[in-house]
Regions:
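Conserved N-terminal beta1-alpha1 strand-loop-helix module at the mouth
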Residues: 1-39
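Active-site mouth loops of central-metabolism enzymes
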Residues: 5-21, 66-78, 133-151, 228-242
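Conserved, mostly hydrophobic/aromatic
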Residues: 9, 37, 87, 159, ...
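Short, acidic/polar
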Residues: 16-29, 51, 77-84, 147-158, ...
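Active-site pocket-lining/capping segments in soluble small-molecule metabolic enzymes
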Residues: 17, 113-139, 188-246, 277-288
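Active-site-adjacent beta->alpha loops and helix N-cap segments on the catalytic face
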Residues: 17-19, 45-58, 76-82, 102-126, ...
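Conserved beta-strand positions in the central sheet of alpha/beta enzyme cores
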Residues: 38, 96-97, 135, 168, ...
């Protein structure tokens, strides 16, 4: 069984302690030689400056390719593309292009009058700008705004037709959910090898339930019961490691070539899952000196 490529998602820190945590997590996971790491972009572009700062910070690690997230919420086309140009000026050649979530309390997505109406328009504009590698979102468990599962596939195909290079899925808990999604994508003419499943190692069960409810990720009853039992017995971390490793292992057995991890700026569980999959970390020369 071949080893998959890896990528890791981080979020921009808010304070000096957060920057130290990000640095430590990125350094630990960069040692696994990921294809890239990405930095998220807050709702409504609320972390625009912090995202760029974090991307520059991560870009200082040797050999690390960084992707900046970019959304079209609450900004004009000119403002959005100025962020893309800032990424390029900082040496970034990868962008995760998303519609984005509206600011809290706004309700549904409302395009800016002078902004991009959706992610497809954003992708096309980025492709026209220059030599960006564009990653997009995909949703094995139906996107909350999608009419049905077929609509998700239609929308994903439009993203690839607009110029996307790869898709990173929302996290999920049942590998069969991903395989069914992959099969539907392939049937629609999408190259399924360009879809990387997203894995969220569970660091906090209560928070993950909230995340799942917000993004529409289905929670299999047996997984929920397992976490609840493990929490009562004080074995939540061990169960989380076993659950994420089993999920990743099944995906790789099923032919997946790239795994995308949502790290929440903590290396521990993600690092241990990678090790359990047989990945070897390579020490940095500076760490050995």
């Amino acid at each position: 069984m071949s080893r998959p490529g890896l990528s890791f998602e981080f979020f921009p820190p808010r304070d000096p302690a957060g920057r130290e945590r990000l640095d430590a997590a990125a350094r630990a996971l960069a040692a696994f030689g990921p294809r890239f790491v990405s930095v998220t972009y807050g709702a409504g572009g609320s972390t625009r400056t912090a995202t760029l700062d974090a991307a520059r910070r991560l870009g200082r690690l040797p050999g690390l390719r960084v992707a900046g997230h970019l959304t079209c919420v609450g900004a004009t086309r000119a403002e959005t593309l100025s962020v893309a140009r800032a990424y390029a000026a900082a040496g970034l050649r990868d962008i995760v292009a998303l519609r984005g979530d509206p600011p809290r309390g706004q309700g549904g997505f409302v395009p800016h009058p002078d902004g991009f109406r959706d992610s497809v328009e954003l992708i096309a504009a980025l492709k026209a700008m220059g030599d960006f590698r564009i990653h997009v979102g995909a949703y094995p468990d139906r996107h909350p705004d999608a009419a049905d599962a077929d609509a998700d596939i239609v929308w994903l195909k439009r993203k690839f037709e607009a110029g996307a290079d790869s898709a990173l899925t929302q996290f999920f808990f049942d590998p069969e959910t991903f395989f069914r999604f992959r099969d539907r994508a392939a049937a629609a003419g999408i190259d399924a090898d360009r879809i990387a499943p997203g894995i969220l190692p569970v660091q906090n069960w209560t928070k993950v339930q909230q995340f799942a409810a917000g993004c529409g990720a289905a929670m299999p009853p047996q997984i929920a019961q397992g976490f609840e039992n493990a929490a009562r017995q004080g074995n939540e971390r061990l169960y989380a490691l076993a659950q994420a490793t089993q999920l990743a292992d099944r995906l790789v057995e099923g032919g997946v070539r790239h795994l995308h991890f949502y790290t929440l700026n903590s290396a521990g569980l993600t690092r241990d899952v990678c090790r359990a999959l047989g990945m070897r970390a390579r020490p940095f020369l500076a760490d050995a000196a």
